From Swiss-Prot:
Signal peptide span: none
LRR repeats (start-end): 99-126, 181-205, 206-232, 233-268, 269-294, 295-326, 327-347, 351-378, 379-403
Keyword match Lipid biosynthesis: no
Keyword terms of this UniProt record: Leucine-rich repeat, Repeat
Molecular functions per Gene Ontology: ubiquitin-like ligase-substrate adaptor activity
Species, as recorded: Homo sapiens (Human)
Protein name: PRAME family member 25
Family, per entry: Belongs to the PRAME family.
Gene that produces this protein: PRAMEF25
GO biological process, one term: negative regulation of DNA-templated transcription
Length: 478
């Protein structure tokens, strides 16, 4: 019985491989090939560098989508060019193959589910299940019906020059821009001369971009060159800015003008939901300019390792676009000498929705903590709270824990080792820390049954990390 089930796929597999061995492979042959043989044979042709077979198989591809990214991880530009040559024949010839369905060339770095499903199907003979397990194609609705082919790509601009596959693709797209639509949903800029970035951005439909990450040591004059492109990304949902610096050669007047040019672009971003800003020095004294230009309710706001004025915090607490936040991260912002009333007001506004709160390394001291406790204890949706790196005493920590007792959704809490845990030289006194943790464990167990509480030390001068310990005195990580 098992033989009768496995024999048909084995015969199909042998027949398919004989097709690949045929040097005079014709389109008529492929048009009679069973659909289920295309994915495994395409993979084999790609791995064996059968360029002519690839070219013809692309033209006869019986699916709407060709997810090529997992295959081009194999370092062979020749096979990639063969696929593009096959697409050329589809785009430029008036007469197309009878079974032609290809509409999407997908070069996004997504899961390899398509190829895995069909490979397993070839081995097991369960082609019907393979068809059922295929994920639906995500189209680009802004270009539906305008061009016969859409090319999905993710752009990671991390070197001075592009890799050879992306260079080949962009050159090919540039020469055929009227015949296809290049759709980029994710753009990462990690390091590349801006003149090269500019030439790439001119080729991309900017309103397709949904996520942008810029992690470069850009000074403000370079940011001004990027600013006009940002304003055209009208479907942008997530923006990450990191390591933006103010050149010492920029005057205060120039800085204000540049910041104004940049922040006014946010008036056009009606889909923005997640905003991440790390080590962005131009925010100091100018956060109100950015906040006043936000036109949507943010779900995520992280402003980390930045210098902010007390007035910036006040503007943040008054911003109408933060009332539905689920994630708030202000770690690394020094608040030691500030009133925390603005933070209290901010927490009151987001109490109904906030799920993640990070106030690590803010330098918050004992006298400041009481200001935020009433608002914090009303954040009933909170599931993660991190407060490490703030030099508070044992008494203040106990008070903090007593206010988070009613937050039933808390799954993870991270607190600093109290000041009493350290010696006069600033190093952790292990015996004292063990005793303090035992006292805290008893106090917490009397109040509630926490899911997970960790206590973090100061940063280690050797490894640069902090160690975490749970209530049972076991080391968590370093």
């Amino acid at each position: 019985m098992k033989m009768s089930i496995r024999t048909p796929p084995r015969l199909l597999e042998l027949a398919g491989r004989s097709v690949l061995r045929d040097q005079a492979l014709a389109m008529s042959t492929l048009e009679e090939l069973p659909t289920e043989l295309f994915p495994p044979l395409f993979m084999e042709a790609f791995s064996r560098r059968r360029c002519e077979a690839l070219k013809l198989m692309v033209q006869a591809w019986p699916f709407r989508r060709l997810p090529l990214r997992p295959l081009i991880k194999m370092p062979c530009l020749e096979t990639f060019q063969a696929v593009l040559n096959g697409l050329d024949a589809l785009l430029t010839h008036g007469v197309r193959p009878r079974r032609w369905k290809l509409q999407v060339l997908d070069l996004q770095d997504v899961c390899e589910n398509f190829w895995m499903v069909w490979s397993e199907a070839m081995a097991r003979g369960c082609f019907l299940n393979a068809k059922r397990n295929k994920k639906p194609v995500q189209d680009c609705p802004r270009m539906r019906g305008r061009q016969p082919l859409t090319v999905f790509v993710e752009l990671w601009l991390k070197n001075r020059t592009l890799d050879e596959h992306l260079t080949c693709l962009l050159l090919w797209v540039k020469q055929r821009k009227d015949l296809l639509h290049l759709c980029c949903k994710k753009l990462k800029i990690l390091g590349m001369p801006f003149r090269n970035i500019r030439s790439i951005l001119k080729m991309v439909n900017l309103d397709c971009i949904q996520e942008v990450e810029v992690n470069c040591k850009w000074v403000l004059p370079i940011l001004t060159q990027f600013t006009p492109y940002l304003g055209h990304m009208r479907n942008l949902q997530k923006l990450v800015l990191s390591h933006m610096d103010v050149s010492r050669y920029v005057s205060p007047e120039q800085k204000k003008e540049i910041v104004t040019q940049f922040t006014t672009q946010f008036l056009k971003l009606h889909c923005l939901q997640k905003l991440y800003m790390n080590s962005v020095s131009f925010l100091e004294g100018h956060l109100d300019q950015l906040l006043s230009c936000l036109k949507t309710s943010l779900k995520v706001l992280t402003i980390t390792n930045c210098v902010l004025l007390e007035s910036d915090l006040k503007h943040l607490s008054q911003c109408p676009s933060i009332s539905q936040l689920k994630t708030l991260d202000l770690s690394g912002i020094r608040l030691t000498n500030y009133s925390l009333v603005p933070l209290q007001i901010l927490l009151e506004k987001v109490a109904a929705t906030l799920e993640y709160l990070d106030l690590d390394d803010c330098g918050i001291i004992d006298s400041q903590v009481n200001a935020i406790l009433p608002a914090l204890s009303r954040c009933f949706e909170l599931n993660t709270f991190s407060f490490c790196g703030n030099p508070i005493s044992m008494a203040t920590l106990e008070n903090l824990l007593s206010h988070t007792i009613i937050l039933k959704n808390l799954c993870l809490e991270l607190y600093p080792a109290p000041r009493e845990s350290y010696g006069a030289d600033g190093t952790l006194c292990w015996s004292r820390f063990t005793q303090i943790r035992a006292e805290l464990m008893k106090r917490v167990r009397d109040l509630r049954h926490p899911k997970r509480i960790l206590f973090g030390t100061d940063y280690c001068p050797d490894c640069g990390n902090r160690s975490f310990y749970d209530l049972e005195a076991d080391q968590y990580c370093c």
